[in-house]
Amino acid sequence: MIRKAFVMQVNADAHEEYQRRHNPIWPELEAVLKSHGAHHYAIYLDQERNLLFATVEIESEERWNAVASTDVCQRWWKHMRDVMPANPDNSPVNAELKEVFYLQ
């Protein structure tokens, strides 16, 4: 498994809405993530700084990257763009984090 972590932002007035939209996520999005090898996906909110920290274990970079081209992912990004900064393609603005410690 490959462990990934990344940071995103959520609009200051959208914390509750962001959480509501993720509880639960669309069943078809969950199915796509799982079928593309994503496991143990978690998102954490830093309310003071409006930051979202995400962690996920993936089976391969290629399968993970392929999620972005699925119809359901494209629809999800469009659905979320009003509660968080988004790129021109509607994907959330994010930055990958470098793992500096891991205790198994």
Swiss-Prot record:
Name of the coding gene: rhaM
This protein's UniProt keywords: Carbohydrate metabolism, Cytoplasm, Isomerase, Rhamnose metabolism
InterPro entries: Dimeric_a/b-barrel, L-rhamnose_mutarotase, Rham/fucose_mutarotase
Lineage: Bacteria, Pseudomonadati, Pseudomonadota, Gammaproteobacteria, Enterobacterales
A Pfam match: rhaM
Provenance organism: Salmonella heidelberg (strain SL476)
Keyword presence, Isomerase: yes
Residues binding substrate: 18, 41, 76-77
UniProt GO cellular component terms: cytoplasm
Protein function: Involved in the anomeric conversion of L-rhamnose.
Name of the protein described by the UniProt record: L-rhamnose mutarotase
